[in-house]
Amino acid sequence: MVEDVRSAEVWAALQANKAARLVDVRTDAEWIYVGLPDLDAAQKEPVLIPWQMFPSGQVNGGFVGQLRGTGMTPEHHIYFLCRSGARSTSAAIAAAAAGFPHVYNIADGFEGPPDAEGHRGQVAGWKAEGLPWRQR
């Protein structure tokens, strides 16, 4: 089962738990143009593995193998992040099915839902919470 958590909870866990890791499953284009969580204060780097390929949107068939290739083990607590919590849910489910028991979906995502004017990053999510982020 995948537990939903909020960005602020994840930031606290990344700082407090040596076994905590953040896996950003957005596309390369999103990492470049929208930005990335800046985990320097937690002495970590986000792990970048796309769940879907850009621009086709096809699911990355090598996702689990790439996750294992980062050195992640079942002992790690893995927090999955996407724009607004949908792709990260799918990625976390795949990781759990592959034997990673401590997986979490960052439900509010990096940018969260759109506001009344259709803009993201204002209502909820990593950016809206004021958590550290940077351009790639």
What kind of region is each of these model predictions?
Residues 80-81:
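Short, surface-exposed ligand- or partner-binding patches at beta-edge/loop junctions that are enriched
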Residues 1-21, 28-77, 88-136:
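Rhodanese-like catalytic fold shared by cysteine-dependent sulfurtransferases
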Residues 85:
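Conserved G/P- and acidic residue-centered "switch" motifs that form tight phosphate/ATP-binding loops
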